[in-house]
Amino acid sequence: MRGLAPPTGQAPPADLVLRDGTTVDVAGLAATASDRHLARHPEEIERHGPYTRDWCRHDLQWVLSWAALDADRGAVDLLAQLDWLARVLSARGYPLASLAEALETLADVAEEELPAA
């Protein structure tokens, strides 16, 4: 997995406005979760290269946006999206245990920062 290019394609939303008017700073929360995860796993940066942090933030931003849209509007099937992401990352050799840890970290950050998360 060395030599990852920076994330391309459709960018995840930076923020979301929920039905009740609450704005969720998706990018900020994903960045916090990514930083925590990679601080605990610096070997990921060594293994995957200089764009590891960008990809981690990108993927966690998507996951948080899917979770918020699923919970708020039922507009996205979070479990289907997570299944897809896990299959993509697994096919690229990314350890699913590390994905699970990153998702737990994202959940912790969301619980700390969002009301009624």
What residue ranges belong to the model's regions?
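Core of compact, soluble alpha-helical bundle domains
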Residues: 1-117
